[in-house]
UniProtKB/Swiss-Prot annotation:
GO annotation terms (biological process): translation
Repressor listed as a keyword: no
Family: Belongs to the universal ribosomal protein uS7 family.
Species of the source: Rhodobacter capsulatus
Keywords for this protein: Ribonucleoprotein, Ribosomal protein, RNA-binding, rRNA-binding, tRNA-binding
Record-level GO cellular component terms: small ribosomal subunit
InterPro entries: Ribosomal_uS7 (IPR000235), Ribosomal_uS7_bac/org-type (IPR005717), Ribosomal_uS7_CS (IPR020606), Ribosomal_uS7_dom (IPR023798), Ribosomal_uS7_dom_sf (IPR036823)
MF annotations from Gene Ontology: rRNA binding; structural constituent of ribosome; tRNA binding
Assembly and oligomerization: Part of the 30S ribosomal subunit. Contacts proteins S9 and S11.
Entry protein name: Small ribosomal subunit protein uS7
Gene that specifies this protein: rpsG
Keyword Disulfide bond in record: no
PANTHER family membership: RIBOSOMAL PROTEIN S7
Length: 156
């Protein structure tokens, strides 16, 4: 790791169909073994399913679902005099987005529908309506931070 300066963040290109950078990040996270075309097919068909069910712009639904999953606080371990405390800290905007994307994908993978398109569409709809595993993960994270509010003075 260089001490001179931090590595520059690379901007992802907007996706082909909707022209949305966040959607590209989502596809990149979903991608396995560099198979981007497979990830694109899964995401686009999931968004088509969502559009068929709610009669709204699919990207709008995607962003609403993502906003409902983004955490505002999380806990980080801090060692103080032999004891480890779970210290609540605010989450940076870039990390919020990354966590929300990761949680949505993991929640979709753990669902019981047959295809990944169905799972992803179901999880996006659930997240849009503030329910589902990804939203539960966010609420659990917030509860953990709230429970450890007493240690917030150990913040860095």
């Amino acid at each position: 790791m260089s001490r001179r300066h931090a590595a520059e963040k690379r901007e992802v290109l907007p996706d082909a169909k909707y022209g949305d950078r966040v959607l590209t990040k989502f596809m990149n996270n979903l991608m396995i073994d560099g198979k981007k075309s497979v990830a694109e097919r899964i995401v686009y068909s999931a968004l088509e399913r969502v559009e068929g069910r709610v009669k709204r712009a699919p990207v709008e639904v995607f962003h609403e679902a993502l906003d409902n999953v983004k955490p505002s606080v999380e806990v980080r371990s801090r060692r103080v005099g032999g004891a480890t405390y779970q210290v609540p800290v605010e989450v940076r905007p870039s990390r919020r987005e990354a966590l929300a994307i990761r949680w949505l994908i993991n929640a979709a993978k753990n669902r019981n529908e047959n295809t990944m398109e169905e799972r992803l569409a179901g999880e996006l709809l659930d997240a849009m309506n503030s329910r589902g595993s990804a939203v539960k993960k966010r609420e659990d994270t917030h509860k953990m931070a709230d429970a450890n509010k007493a240690f917030s003075h150990y913040r860095w």
